[in-house]
Amino acid sequence: MPLGASRVAGARPEYESYRYELWKLLVNSGIEFDFTGTENDGANYPNFNGLSFDRDHEGRGGINSSEIRSGIDAWLRESGVPDIVLFSSPGGNDDLTSITYESVLDNINAIVDAIQAINPEATIIIEQAAPPMTNEQTSEFLAVYNQIIQDVVTIAERQSTTTSKVMTVDMATGFTDAMLADDVHYNEAGARFIATR
């Protein structure tokens, strides 16, 4: 289950999601898999190796951690129990003028709890998110961004169990402005970069 906001949903042709590039990599690998989620975008994706792109996902543009926390139980029940959840840009759309940073971390932990409650053997991969365009990186932004990059590692370590592996993946190192279609969303190069991580 690809879970998150607009970087998961994509909005072709304006900007890309990593899902199509990841899907092609998985098809090439020969791994049997099925993307899950209650969302399904209508963008045009070319067939690959004679197969049609699996469009299912759980990405919603603009959604914040409180909204994901509120919706996750219903989405999991509707879409089916995932074996693997790819949790993109946790906290990325949270406005810290209306929610505390500690509440964002509580939401991320609660989202992981909800996934583990429905599948105690789930593998949960939490992004250390790729940064936005350099000109968007104010000192205030960087203070929060750098902190959450570290805090999701702590969350993953604490939330891992003997049956449910929670891990992080570094999407930030090596990511450049040339991989963005606008201030925050991926272009094709950015989508490929994220998919290969």
Regions found by a protein language model. Give the residues of each.
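Extracytoplasmic/secreted cell-surface and envelope-processing proteins
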Residues: 10-12, 93-102, 132-142, 176-181
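Conserved SGNH/GDSL esterase-like catalytic core that processes O-acyl groups on lipids
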Residues: 7-106
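Loop/turn elements at helix/coil->beta-strand transitions in domains of secreted/extracellular proteins
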Residues: 29-34, 80-86, 118-125, 161-167
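Histidine-centered active-site loop/cap adjacent to the catalytic His
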Residues: 1-3, 182-197
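Active-site segments of SGNH/GDSL-like serine hydrolases
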Residues: 88-93, 112-146, 170-172
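Stable alpha-helical elements in mature extracytoplasmic
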Residues: 14, 18, 68, 72, ...
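Substrate-gating cap/lid alpha-helix
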Residues: 129-170, 188-192
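Short hydrophobic segments within beta-strands
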Residues: 3-4, 36, 127
